[in-house]
């Protein structure tokens, strides 16, 4: 619902138009493209989508299939929720210990993603198999970040998702040679700085019903971001210095705003103040220093 979405994104500045686009996309549970210029929060949005689903889930620690053992619970991607064992309101001491309660998972794979991570892989020493990423992210969100920059060709990666996106189940090959069908019950998000139509053909785009552009923040949103980031960086907000920054390094340069820049520029100003051994304070001189370095090749 809209209220769930607002709560999930309460720590981000998201305008109404973006919320209204994200809501139906999340409810569909099918898949979405998040695209736009780098630094505008695509990954931050994707990371918070799972919060809108709410609550927690139970998953088996491992799966046993005809002699093959597949480890599903992964402390690297799953956050275990520890319950009271009998002293609290609910007595969970009798819960089958083969199951574990976790926060709904958000699994993020970036440019380092390889095809082997999407298949069952067996450890040759222990003979125990590792579940693929899409199995670990069931009942949550799988984010393919920096889509189009993986080492494998884009069409190879896309072909891997055609059946799961269409049928809501996936096929996995086990080391024994057996093929099994598993649920594909999750939202998959492709996040990219590139134009989707330049990456994939129309047939695949049809299977991703929601394509949402994450645009540049407005000037008002940019100012709001600075005001939020200032105390987090140890600064008091200085309207005159902020106006100087915007007038000199944005309006005069015809430079677009990016959501990441308040944080990045304030970090530069902070380092400048530490180096000069002066109080941490916004100033035109400090913003000139930060902008000259930050925008030198941009």
Predicted regions, residues:
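Conserved C-terminal helix/linker of AAA+ ATPases
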Residues: 259-266, 272-298
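Conserved ASCE/P-loop NTPase catalytic core
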Residues: 6-190
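Helical "lid/switch" subdomain of P-loop NTPase nucleotide-binding domains
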Residues: 153-157, 196, 200, 204
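Short, mixed-charge aromatic SLiMs
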Residues: 48-54, 251-252, 287-298
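Dynamic helix-loop-helix/coil hinge segments at AAA+ ATPase domain boundaries and subdomain interfaces
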Residues: 1-19, 235, 252-256
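Conserved C-terminal "switch" segment of AAA+ ATPases
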Residues: 197-201, 214-262, 275-280
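Amphipathic alpha-helical interaction segments
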Residues: 20, 24, 44, 160, ...
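Amphipathic alpha-helical segments in well-structured domains
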Residues: 158-161, 205, 283
């Amino acid at each position: 619902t809209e209220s769930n979405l607002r709560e999930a994104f309460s720590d981000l500045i998201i305008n109404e138009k973006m919320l209204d686009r994200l809501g139906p996309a999340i409810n569909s549970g099918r898949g979405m493209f998040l695209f736009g210029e780098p630094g505008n929060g695509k990954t931050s949005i994707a990371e918070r989508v799972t919060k809108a689903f709410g609550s927690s889930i139970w998953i088996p620690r491992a799966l046993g299939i005809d002699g093959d053992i597949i480890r599903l619970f992964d402390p690297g991607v799953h956050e275990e929720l520890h319950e009271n064992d009998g002293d609290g309101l609910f007595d969970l001491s009798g819960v089958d210990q083969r199951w574990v309660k976790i926060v709904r998972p958000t699994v993020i794979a970036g440019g380092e993603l390889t095809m082997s991570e999407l298949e069952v892989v067996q450890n040759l020493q222990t003979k125990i198999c590792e579940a693929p990423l899409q199995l670990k992210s069931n009942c949550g969100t799988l984010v393919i970040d920096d889509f189009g920059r993986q080492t494998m060709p884009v069409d190879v990666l896309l072909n891997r998702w055609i059946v799961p996106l269409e049928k809501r189940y996936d096929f996995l090959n086990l080391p024994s040679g057996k093929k099994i069908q598993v649920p594909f019950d999750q939202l998959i998000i492709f996040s990219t700085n590139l134009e989707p139509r330049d990456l994939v053909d129309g047939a695949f785009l049809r299977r991703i019903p929601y394509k949402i552009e994450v645009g540049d923040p407005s000037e008002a949103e940019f100012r709001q971001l600075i005001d939020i980031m200032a105390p987090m960086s140890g600064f008091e907000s200085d309207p005159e210095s902020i106006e100087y920054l915007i007038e000199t390094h944005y309006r005069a340069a015809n430079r677009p705003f990016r959501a990441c820049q308040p944080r990045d520029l304030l970090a530069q100003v902070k380092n400048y103040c530490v180096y000069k051994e002066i109080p941490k304070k916004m100033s035109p001189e400090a913003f000139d220093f930060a902008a000259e370095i930050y925008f030198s090749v941009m």
